[in-house]
Amino acid sequence: MRSSWTPLGPPVSQDRIITSFPKWYTPDACLQLKEHFHSRVSTACQHRNTGTAGLRLSKVVVVGDLYVGKTSLIHRLCKNVFDHDYKATIGVDFEIERFEIAGIPYSLQIWDTAGQEKFKCIASAYYRGAQVIITAFDLTDVQTLEHTRQWLEDVLRENEAGSCFIFLVGTKKDLLSGAACEQAEAEAVHLANEMQAEYWSVSAKTGENVKAFFSRVAALAFEQSVLQDLEKRPSTQSQVGDGDGDLIRIEVPKTQENKRPPGLGCC
């Protein structure tokens, strides 16, 4: 019998449904150049055999200097608004954004951290367990780009080496054009390669590239979750959910399904 999942929570919005592997922003600084999901992931999704991928949230940590637009970026994604009356984040805040990837429910838990030095000790406690690190800077302020090195070091100090996807994101793209934008992006791409990060330019004000960027983040995190689950999967599977009522029912092999404890027979 083919396994299936039954969504019981609110439906995912249409622009959060991902059916094909999202493309990079620039091939000069991207984590993966491929254009399709891993074949094992595609097969698992087709058979709704993705294990705990629908159960887990991927933790995304967003860091960067004060006023680079971290909160505005997150609000554009989650609320589709741009805040003209900006208030600095105090400590940390987070949003949960639901996606459907190759037919499977999946969520990002996006942590918005304060850019002020005085809140660093508070925010650092929330860096642990990140699957994705987004280091944001202002495309119009080269100093904020230089500071991303330290922000990345701070987050990596709380996580295992090689365990996180790293993104370098230039904000306020709407304020630059032509040669000025090309120059700023060239410098950022150079740094992204040093960081082993994928680079994106976005605008929270206009919404340019915001949905595409987070779709890319979600797809990479989802694929990694499924592959990790396939590697450590036990012989018997069961039904799992994502905490919001989305269920994934995993098929149990017949050799296990039909086995009875000794001494038990049919009534």
UniProtKB/Swiss-Prot annotation:
| Record: residues binding Mg(2+) | T71, T89, D112
Q: Which Gene3D superfamilies match?
A: P-loop containing nucleotide triphosphate hydrolases (3.40.50.300)
Q: List where the motif Switch 1 lies.
A: 76-94
Q: Which domain of life is it from?
A: Eukaryota
Broad EC category: hydrolase
Q: Where does GTP bind?
A: V68, G69, K70, T71, S72, D83, Y86, T89, G115, K172, D174, S203, A204, K205
Q: How is its activity regulated?
A: Regulated by guanine nucleotide exchange factors (GEFs) which promote the exchange of bound GDP for free GTP. Regulated by GTPase activating proteins (GAPs) which increase the GTP hydrolysis activity. Inhibited by GDP dissociation inhibitors (GDIs).
Q: What is its EC number?
A: 3.6.5.2
Q: Does the keyword Magnesium apply?
A: yes
The record's catalysed reaction(s) read:
GTP + H2O = GDP + phosphate + H(+)
Q: Which Pfam families does its entry note?
A: Ras
Q: Can you provide one Gene Ontology molecular function annotated for this UniProt record?
A: GTPase activity
Which keywords, in A-to-Z order, does the entry hold?
Golgi apparatus, GTP-binding, Hydrolase, Lipoprotein, Magnesium, Membrane, Metal-binding, Nucleotide-binding, Prenylation, Protein transport, Transport
User: What is one term from the GO cellular component aspect held by the record?
Assistant: Golgi membrane
As for membrane topology, the entry says: Lipid-anchor
Lipid-carrying residues in chain (S-geranylgeranyl cysteine): C266, C267
Q: Name the coenzymes or cofactors required.
A: Mg(2+)
Family according to the record: Belongs to the small GTPase superfamily. Rab family.
This protein's domain notes: Switch 1, switch 2 and the interswitch regions are characteristic of Rab GTPases and mediate the interactions with Rab downstream effectors. The switch regions undergo conformational changes upon nucleotide binding which drives interaction with specific sets of effector proteins, with most effectors only binding to GTP-bound Rab.
UniProt protein name: Ras-related protein Rab-36
Q: Which organism is it from?
A: Mus musculus (Mouse)
Q: What is the lineage of its organism?
A: Eukaryota, Metazoa, Chordata, Craniata, Vertebrata
